[in-house]
Amino acid sequence: MRNIVIPLTALFLNAMAVSAQSVSNVFGFPSTEPGYSLGVSACYAGQIGDYLVMAGGCNFPTPGNKTYYAGIYAARVDATVLNWQLVGLLPEPAAYGATVANGDSLLFIGGNNAEHSLKSVYSIHLNASGDKAEVQRLAHLPCTIDNMAAAMSGNNIYLSGGNQDGKPSANVLHHNMVDGKGQWYIAATVPGSPRVQPVSAATDGNVYVWGGFYVNGENSEVHTDGYCLNTTTGAWTALAAPRSVNGKQTTLSGGIAWTEGKRVFATGGVNKDIFLDAISGRYEFVKKEDYLLQPIEWYKFSGNLYTFDVKGNKWLKTKFADKALARAGAVVVPTEIGTYYIGGELKPSVRTPQIVIVKE
């Protein structure tokens, strides 16, 4: 990915001054692999010690030519400039998986590429100088899985929805990292129809899932609501959809969520009506052949920053939105200096190399 300087005025047109929440631009993006500098979506990313790590992802260097990447990159955490270097390679190019932290390592879970979906789990560790990644293959998942959401509560990993063994699913896979058995199993199923590209978060033994879509012809769905799984009792509780700064119910499909204390934050995602019109095959808003040709603003990706109060079990009033957050397929890495919001797409097939820090 090349380093692109974007005028700050373009980033903050929608910022709401009444909120303490903010977004600030960070310069620097990986550029070693040809085409990567254009920006990628659906990459793996996390923090190891003082370093940000990102890997894989995909983009369209030329129209219609979707490319997947295998590079593993690291950069020392910094609020203004990230100096990325290639520190290793994935065993194969991959995107649309998930990342969770595991001590001084990261786990890259599932995903897919142009050839197949993956059931692999890799442990990524950096050496002391942060210039070499060690990649270790762990026990396989029980099925291939991609476009799912991952959440972690204590030593427990939960993978919700996505495509499992090539089919849209609502299953929740569970793995305990310290039980010594190394087994994954289906712990629960989110009520209702499958959810591809949902968001998820976990805290205090509860797993939260919102959004996601299901392609099924005229019966296709773009979910706005969510559910909370009590992992002790196995019971599900229905959750309301988030609402924009304008009070409109929105979807988190294609967005991202993360936890901070007793709150869940979420941002990004597609516009429900426009996306549903396309995946259902109706194309009432625009002709099918013109769908990918519209300007970025037409797709109305969400730039809202949502806050869910775990204790009150409700969304707080949304007070902040920014065009820099209006993406799908971006990833987040929470750190002590803020949450890095990395890459993603601005519209179908158009990626961004922009990284910002979100202050909640």
Feature names for model-found ranges:
Residues 21-360:
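Kelch-like beta-propeller repeat domains
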